[in-house]
């Protein structure tokens, strides 16, 4: 087992900087596209054998130092009773967004092993195949709540923020229910064999720091506290969260994921003693080889004083990224960071 990723998460010395990429199992890989040509996205997410195949692809093809479970953060919302659709070209849709207490009351807190047993089976199967650590994950309550309230993706989050400020009790009720379900979901993943867990807060950066502290952070803290019994690295990724960095560090996470909008060395000085993950702009993978290697070298140099660095993108890899560019990045990180 190559445990370089786990060592970096714990802030231990490593022979080189480990790398994996958010959304590394996905649309940019021809092998993934071939599978998706036969099944819908939701069908794929619920098929353990296919999920195993997709999860393994970037590890086998590109040499990643960790695998991340192939799934989606909104699978849990469907298990809670929210009708979920994935429409080509417009992403996830909840046709019945939560607008009132009646809709909230209709959501359930499912038994994770029962309602999302296909996820746990995928984890168990992967542990028998992988020679690198397996990362499980869930969406942070705030990010998941935005989808339930907006009915899908949003650019301005009008419905979410309107509810926060005009119906705070309803908003907190939604967050409470999602939090309880997420705790059970991630605990089940840990029991199934996940070796690290990441909490994706894709939309945290739309919040003012004072609102993040009230409406989002307390729920993340509760989730992380509930996972301490498993002694696994917990990664918290708050996208566009440079203004939230110190508060994110108080979440209890072992590792903070960074987007590309902050210098990783500066981040390390602001939150000393915590491992950091990131943080090249996903579009920088399109650079010519020499310029990409130079960009990677700069990030590695900036991160030299960070106590534990996992190289990653600042967000998910873009679907039109040539796989060979991802391979160049993996090789560059390994070569340039070799101690």
UniProtKB/Swiss-Prot annotation:
It catalyses: uroporphyrinogen III + 4 H(+) = coproporphyrinogen III + 4 CO2. SUPFAM superfamilies: UROD/MetE-like. The record marks 72 as: Transition state stabilizer. It is an enzyme of class 4 (lyase). Pathway: Porphyrin-containing compound metabolism; protoporphyrin-IX biosynthesis; coproporphyrinogen-III from 5-aminolevulinate: step 4/4. InterPro entries: UROD/MetE-like_sf (IPR038071), Uroporphyrinogen_deCO2ase_HemE (IPR006361), Uroporphyrinogen_deCOase (IPR000257). It is found in: Cytoplasm. Substrate binds at residues 23-27, 72, 147, 202, 315. GO terms for molecular function: uroporphyrinogen decarboxylase activity. The keyword Metal-binding does not apply. Keywords: Cytoplasm, Decarboxylase, Lyase, Porphyrin biosynthesis. Its EC number is 4.1.1.37. GO terms for cellular component: cytosol. GO terms for biological process: protoporphyrinogen IX biosynthetic process. Belongs to the uroporphyrinogen decarboxylase family. PANTHER family: METHYLTETRAHYDROFOLATE:HOMOCYSTEINE METHYLTRANSFERASE RELATED (PTHR21091), UROPORPHYRINOGEN DECARBOXYLASE (PTHR21091:SF169). Catalyzes the decarboxylation of four acetate groups of uroporphyrinogen-III to yield coproporphyrinogen-III. Homodimer. This is Uroporphyrinogen decarboxylase. It comes from Desulfotalea psychrophila (strain LSv54 / DSM 12343).
């Amino acid at each position: 087992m190559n445990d370089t990723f786990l060592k970096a998460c714990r802030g231990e010395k490593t022979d080189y900087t480990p790398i994996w990429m958010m959304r590394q199992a996905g649309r940019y890989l021809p092998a993934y596209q071939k599978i998706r040509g036969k099944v819908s996205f939701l069908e794929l997410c619920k098929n353990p054998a296919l999920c195993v195949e997709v999860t393994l692809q970037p590890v086998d093809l590109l040499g990643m130092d960790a695998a991340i479970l192939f799934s989606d953060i909104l699978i849990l919302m469907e298990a809670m009773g929210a009708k979920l659709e994935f429409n080509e070209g417009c992403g996830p849709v909840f046709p019945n967004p939560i607008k009132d207490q009646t809709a909230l009351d209709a959501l359930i807190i499912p038994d994770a092993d029962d309602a999302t047993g296909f996820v746990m089976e995928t984890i168990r199967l992967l542990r028998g195949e992988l020679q690198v650590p397996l990362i499980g994950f869930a969406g942070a309550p705030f990010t998941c709540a935005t989808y339930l309230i907006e009915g899908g993706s949003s650019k301005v989050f009008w419905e979410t923020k309107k509810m926060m400020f005009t119906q705070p009790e309803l908003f907190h009720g939604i967050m409470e229910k999602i939090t309880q379900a997420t705790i059970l979901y991630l605990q089940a993943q840990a029991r199934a064999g996940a070796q690290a867990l990441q909490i994706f807060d894709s939309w945290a950066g739309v919040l003012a720091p004072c609102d993040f502290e009230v409406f989002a952070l307390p729920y993340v803290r509760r989730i992380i506290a509930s996972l301490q019994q498993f002694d696994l690295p917990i990664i918290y990724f708050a996208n566009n969260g440079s203004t939230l960095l110190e508060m994110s560090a108080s979440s209890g996470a072992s590792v903070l994921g960074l987007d590309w909008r902050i210098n990783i060395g500066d981040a390390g000085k602001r939150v000393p003693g915590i491992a950091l993950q990131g943080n090249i702009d996903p579009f920088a993978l399109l650079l010519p080889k020499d310029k990409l290697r130079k960009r990677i070298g700069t990030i590695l140099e900036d991160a030299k004083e960070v106590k534990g660095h996992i190289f990653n993108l600042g967000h998910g890899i873009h679907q039109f990224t040539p796989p060979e560019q991802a391979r160049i990045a993996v090789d560059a990180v390994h070569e340039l960071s070799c101690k």
